[in-house]
Amino acid sequence: MTLPPSCRWSGDHLELLDQRQLPGAVVFMQLRRWQQVAEAISSMAVRGAPAIGIAAAWGVVLAARSGDDLLTAFRGLRASRPTAVNLRWALNRMQAAMGSSASVDVEALTDAAAALQREDCVLTQRLVDHGVSLLAQGCRVLHHCHTGAIATGGVGTALGVIAAAHARGLLRHAWLDETRPRLQGAALSAWELGCLGVPCTVIVDGASGLLMRRGEVDAVMVGCDRVSANGDVANKIGTYNLALVARAHGIPFYVCAPGSSIDRATVDGEAITIEERDAEEITHVRGMDVAAPGAQVWNPAFDITPAHLVTGFITEFGVLRPPYREVLSELPLPNQL
């Protein structure tokens, strides 16, 4: 089965894959206003840091086509999710495409958004090729959250590496954390790998330690929403736990990080804003109440994994090894300020 794109431009509107409907149905939302794009981002209809950035870029195009105030649109889109730096990076690209002219060039903005999406397709393929080079014949890889094709504009990042390893005859098995509370691993990663015929098993998040202790994992590969200047990683809640357990068992822990996710303006992980989401994501599953009435809830969407727990960063530039502050400072990244 061919995987659907995360989004596609259709002449005068954006067609956005509604990931909330998966794995039950493949549904594309028809978006014609930037406010709809912002809502799709904040409600997690679109997920994955690269896909969020691409969607936001098309949101700017919709604002320009509608004659909306672009400053308001930029602010609204930027605020839709605070942790993923790709969102800011994409919006900065769109601001640069506007130039210094007082008039709004809709065609130039459309070209800029399309170019950003095409580039992501190329860059993710490069990243995946570098990642596959780390894996040995018969490898078993553990993955957290969802980092597949529909989370990007191309083949995906960490899950793309797993899929490519299977296609090249290297992968023995993929283990997928279910990834509470939104179940991205069970709903999205398992769906993508199933479509591609990749052998995989979904596990509860807390089972990863037992799996490693039994010698069933050769590598852990995850994506990221932001990498700070020193190599600290903001990613889906539970990533830090996974990195600690991997270190305890001597298992390499790799972070797939496209250049758009690397934020050299943020000194370390402590400076990264951690999004906190609605309590109902924990107290309810598929609309069913599963928590005791009145139970207090804390629902951070991300955590911070310290750089010293990262074996290597897999990027479109190659595989990066410590010392990360020095290595990251030398990458030819665009200005994200």
Curated annotation (Swiss-Prot):
It catalyses: 5-(methylsulfanyl)-alpha-D-ribose 1-phosphate = 5-(methylsulfanyl)-D-ribulose 1-phosphate. This is Methylthioribose-1-phosphate isomerase. One of its GO terms (biological process) is L-methionine salvage from methylthioadenosine. Its EC number is 5.3.1.23. Substrate binds at R47, G48, A49, R81, Q184, N235, K236. The lineage of its organism: Bacteria, Bacillati, Cyanobacteriota, Cyanophyceae, Synechococcales. The gene is mtnA. Belongs to the eIF-2B alpha/beta/delta subunits family. MtnA subfamily. Keywords: Amino-acid biosynthesis, Isomerase, Methionine biosynthesis. HAMAP family: Salvage_MtnA. InterPro entries: IF-2B-related, IF-M1Pi, IF_2B-like_C, Initiation_fac_2B_a/b/d, M1Pi_N, NagB/RpiA_transferase-like. Catalyzes the interconversion of methylthioribose-1-phosphate (MTR-1-P) into methylthioribulose-1-phosphate (MTRu-1-P). The active site is at D225. The record marks C145 as: Transition state stabilizer. Gene3D superfamilies: translation initiation factor eif-2b, domain 1, Translation initiation factor eif-2b, domain 2. Pathway: Amino-acid biosynthesis; L-methionine biosynthesis via salvage pathway; L-methionine from S-methyl-5-thio-alpha-D-ribose 1-phosphate: step 1/6.
